[in-house]
Amino acid sequence: MAVPKRKTSPAKRGMRRSADALKAPTYIEDKNSGELRRPHHIDLKTGMYRGRSVLVVKD
């Protein structure tokens, strides 16, 4: 069984756990519709992504 050679210091433990916290999702205002959407995601209202229509929107 593997056993640690040295004790992990509280600073090292804290640095390891720093990424464990949940972060609030980021939203940006869409240039075309003005709706809020996630970055690098399709705007579901218009079906546009990076200036191109990639999704046919149902009315």
Swiss-Prot record:
Protein name: Large ribosomal subunit protein bL32
Keywords, ordered alphabetically: Ribonucleoprotein, Ribosomal protein
Lineage: Bacteria, Pseudomonadati, Pseudomonadota, Alphaproteobacteria, Hyphomicrobiales
Molecular function as annotated in GO: structural constituent of ribosome
Gene name of the record: rpmF
Family: Belongs to the bacterial ribosomal protein bL32 family.
GO cellular component: large ribosomal subunit
HAMAP family: Ribosomal_bL32
InterPro entries noted in UniProt: Ribosomal_bL32, Ribosomal_bL32_bact, Ribosomal_zn-bd
